[in-house]
């Protein structure tokens, strides 16, 4: 994360390592592979426990890349935007005022929907459900334009990895 500071009457962003991740971020051991053309990254699923209704426990799922390299951060929140194998999840909203930044944002968005789709299918299979009955067991709420990529991503996974026909995947 980063914090805002003022130096010489200018606002700057600096790294802010405010808490040790191990105290609240639980590594689940679940990993997925995400391909970006000829590049591949391995994601790691972390959970944050969230107390729910009547002391129930909910999980907030967070995906990170296995090979994140925080040393790429140079000054403030400036970093090499093209080394996605090392920087994909360094910052939530990287500067996208140039082509490299725009591409990094698209990679981040695809990374999240690809992992989310893989996690949904993994959990459905673990519960013993047939993936052909997916709509009976899963509802996906899409709150923005970028997460809509989950629709073609689910179709891609179902057709290329699960053996569905295109018509079956769309249904």
PLM feature segments, named:
Residues 1-171:
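A conserved ligand/cofactor-binding region detector
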């Amino acid at each position: 994360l980063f914090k805002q500071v003022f130096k010489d009457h200018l606002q700057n962003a600096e790294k802010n390592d405010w808490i040790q991740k191990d105290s609240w971020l639980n590594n689940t051991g679940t990993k997925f592979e995400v391909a970006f053309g000829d590049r591949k990254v391995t994601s790691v699923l972390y959970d944050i426990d969230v107390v729910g209704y009547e002391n129930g426990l909910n999980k907030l799922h967070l995906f990170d890349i296995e090979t994140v390299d925080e040393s790429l951060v140079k000054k403030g929140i400036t970093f090499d935007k093209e080394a996605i194998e090392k920087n994909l999840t360094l910052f939530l909203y990287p500067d996208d005022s140039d082509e490299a930044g725009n591409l990094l944002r698209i990679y981040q968005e695809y990374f999240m929907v690809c992992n989310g789709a893989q996690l949904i299918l993994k959990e459905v299979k673990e519960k013993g459900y047939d993936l052909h009955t997916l709509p009976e067991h899963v509802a996906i709420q899409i709150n923005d334009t970028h997460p809509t990529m989950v629709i073609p991503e689910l179709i891609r996974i179902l057709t290329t990895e699960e053996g569905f026909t295109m018509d079956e995947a769309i249904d």
